[in-house]
Amino acid sequence: KVPVIVAWSPYGKSTGNAPKYNAIFDMLGMDPSKVSGLMKFEGPDPAFWCAHGYAVCNPDPRGAFNSEGDILVWSRQEGKDYHDLIEWLAAQDWCSGKVGTSGNSYLAISQWFVAAEQPPHLAAIAPWEGMSDIYRDLVARGGIPDFGFPHMLSRSFVGKNLREDLAAEGEQHPLVNALWESKIPEFEKITVPAYVVASYSNSIHTPGTFRGWRRMGSSEKWLRIHNNMEWPDYYEEANLADLRRFFDHYLKGEQNGWEETPKVRYALMDMAGNDQIGVPADAFPPSDFEMTKLYLDAESRSLSPTSATGTTASYDGAAADGAATFFFKVDTPTQFVGYPKLHIWVEADGNDDIDLFVFLQKLNADGQPLEQITVPNNGPVMQGITKAGASILNYKGSNGRLRASMRHLDDAHSSDEIPAHSFDKIEKLAPGEVVALDIDMFPVGLILYPGEQLRLIVTGHNIVGGAMPMVENVQTCNHGRHIIHTGGDRASYLQLPVKSTK
């Protein structure tokens, strides 16, 4: 008898080497010889896992392909369906009674939902980059409707009946309600051992993966943060071996020392070819980092540990080049690891709302912004594809976004470190009204050397473009001017964990 690993998604049972996916992998520079083609898209490869004493189950969920019913996308009902499959598998005469789950993207998201259902025979999960709140991570991140990827996603689901349309639901239900609450797993009920993999650069999955890891109830949870894109990372031999140690321990009962693995391993990126991978830590952010506020100064366009007198900066909120920028230069090697937050005072001139986009970039000593292709193919073609879009394939720094009228905080889930918004009410701006926004940003793991800088860009448009090739950029409500207030009794600041070294 053997344990079984489940890969749950509506992408088909064994389409991992379908021509459309092979074309994508070729473009990304991934080596096709590393996989057998037996796996489903984004799932575990049976050629590897079966050779090491596991079965792999590739189900078609409700409504997908020949399965009955309608396709429901990321909901608690899907978690219940997944629960029933796990319990059925555990009862088969070839199964040891131990079941694990694995895979990235959809296959990771579904793991949050099934783990919250607590099937008795689920022994361990391994979500490899996946959203954990469909409204906040996909449909309306920052309260700003963004239907480009949902439209593309819906065309990936094939079945004989109906399929859920997330974009249409986003248009019909622009505020968080019971529908969107049903697409948030009950994190506190996730108590099974978990190996969670995340990155700083995934414009679709990064916030949700970190949220899932933070909020899950399990005391046996590990986080590994890598420095590239999920697909090459998932099939990398060293990472397969690492995941196998995890499953061998929890699905086979092997005493292989897995429990001594650092609870957090993170990437420290210099964005110049010398990233440090697998840095061990006791937490994220690591406990030896100090939360620091860098105050915006609209007059000097600087970020400083001390606040200046009150002043303002403004720009055309609808213009492609409209932005306010602020700089912080280091004179000693300085690490920034954890969750940035921007607390910023804003005013709308000529509008009753603002869609605000913020970006935190690393500049080298010559003042040039650094970026890093996240897939093996980093040649001219990929540079061109990612110049103004396909942000999942080219890391250009941390980002955040928020619609000013959706600024109300969710007291149940907000912290000083990571703000969370309720998105259940609209609070428009009155003429001349100045309001404070708290904007959560993608986590970072950056090291800067003497003479290098952080650059904070505050703007009215998403300068990195759509998440994937052919995904349209988010449309905004912006017109008129955005006025940024800094200093005095309206001290705007960037907060992030910092450690200086000699």
Functional labels for PLM-detected ranges:
Residues K1-E259, K263:
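Active-site-proximal cap/loop segments of hydrolase catalytic domains
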